[in-house]
A protein has these predicted regions:
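Glycine-rich phosphate-binding loops of nucleotide-dependent enzymes
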Residues: 1-160
Length: 160
């Protein structure tokens, strides 16, 4: 379970979040809906450590947490898939899915394991038709977004 209590965030005199509070229960899908500029992305960037909150509290499984940067969020098991694509179009699908966590065997990149991980993640998402050896930039935008989700899932987060 994740709880947001009275989260506030200001940018140069503009209030982005004004005492936002809500709870997302474990095992459930929670959607944030709102107009452009309502603060949805700001709240997610606070959760993932890209922004710091000005005030308020975030609790995960009843424990207050201080998410100071993206590494702290990752250590807490928080993963995110932004709507903007961030993949490397010149790399393969498998390289994109495991980038930063590349499997190594005997001191060398293990490309077989890399492909295996990518296939497993895509299969979990029902996207076994995506070729892990294809360059990401050759895929449709929707397929690239599926690869972004697979990359997040490969990190085995507790919270997505």
């Amino acid at each position: 379970m994740i709880e947001f209590k009275d989260i506030c965030k200001h940018f140069q005199g503009t209030t982005a979040l004004d005492h936002v509070s809500f709870t997302a229960e474990s095992g459930q899908i929670t959607a944030l809906l709102g107009q452009n500029g309502a603060g949805k992305s700001t709240l997610m960037k606070i959760l993932t450590g890209a922004y710091q909150k000005d005030s308020g509290e975030i609790r995960i499984d009843g424990r207050s947490v201080n998410i100071t940067d993206p590494n702290a969020a990752e250590a807490l098991g928080i993963g995110i898939v932004y709507q903007e694509l961030s993949g490397m179009p010149h790399l393969t699908v498998s390289e994109n899915i495991v980038i930063g966590r590349d499997p190594v065997r005997h001191g060398f990149l293990d490309f077989k394991k890399q492909r295996e991980i990518a296939r497993q993640m895509l299969n979990r998402l029902g996207a076994s038709d995506i070729d892990v050896d294809q360059r990401l930039g050759e895929l449709s935008v929707s397929q690239q977004q599926i690869c972004e989700i697979a990359k997040c899932m490969a990190e085995e987060p507790k919270i997505v």
